[in-house]
Amino acid sequence: MLLAGSCDWLEVSPSNEVNEEDLFAKGSGYRNALNGIYLNMSDNSLYGRNLSYGFIEVLGHQYLPEHLKNTGSYYKTYQFLYDDTDVKSFISVMWSKGYNVIASCNNLIHNISEADAMLFDGVEMEKNMIWGEALALRALMHFELLRMFAPSMEVDDGKAYIPYVDEYPVINTTYYTNAEILKKIEADFKEARRLVAMCDVEQHPEWMQYDVRMRGDGVTTDLPDDVFYAFRGYRMNYYAITAWMARMYMWAKDYDAAFSCSEEVINSTYKDRAYFDFINSAELSKDKKDSKSLIFTISHNNVLTDEYKPFTNNGSGRGTSGADFVCAWKR
């Protein structure tokens, strides 16, 4: 369990501010707002590094400590030195960035809930898609913060550890118990799944095929006319939400519900062809990207040049954070 404190983490202050009335006057503004949320989530302080292969994996001791010595703050994280200034900075930034993402979701949800469906090129389907994804991202971010900043359900003491923020602007910040937070997360996920189902399940299940959802290509008749509807694998699609629900239920120790959600994802098909090809370890060695089994991913275009390329140019595996992560990974 991590601790953090801040007073400005519920503000939305983009560097390229656009008047809110202008932004939400057109359907394209809602698209831009949603894309901005995904972009913020790809920041290195969140899924661009620390919530994927960085801080979280170091805490889980997925790296060899002798190689982490070159990373400084990550080596301190490995040793659980939570009072160290650098480690405190990691924790504080994850807290503030996480709730800033939530604030952006709430702003979008607040506006789209009252928007006329005719503003959108895809009318009701597009409105529901954007609305549902924003709800799902709000739930996802709260769940991640709950896992980091509250005790697990194994040792839950019934105390309130984090706020669940579902309004914009924020009037009051109320902290809730694990059980209360999980109930709110579940409600958001369920409503989000209902909303995105119009596109992903009812009207255009073909867009969830691998070639369309991950590559943006495929059989001509399967391709959406508008690229906004393509690449559903990089967005909170119906099956991504269902998979996150399975993860949430596992954490909550509701194993029957977790199994049900997992089974739905695993058995999902289009014209008797599985959406996701979950490969074994031998096949994984042939396909390092393993993109056919990806249910949801966040795009971070610079990760190759920022992390892997410096390592390839430095055979010693020293001097860059990317190199140290590659060398330290426990194979």
Identify the function of each model-found stretch:
Residues A115-M125, L195-G216, P224-R232:
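Flexible helix-coil transition and linker loops at the boundaries of alpha-helical arrays
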Residues I181, D188, L195, C261-E264:
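Alpha-helical solenoid repeat scaffolds, predominantly canonical TPR units
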Residues L146-M153, D200, W251-K253:
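Short coil/turn linking the two alpha-helices of tandem helical-hairpin repeats
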Residues C7-L59, S262:
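Membrane-proximal, proline-rich intrinsically disordered regions
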Residues N32, D211-M214, V219, F228-Y238, ...:
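Hydrophobic-face positions in mid-chain alpha helices that act as interaction patches
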Residues M1-G5:
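Sec-dependent bacterial lipoprotein signal peptides
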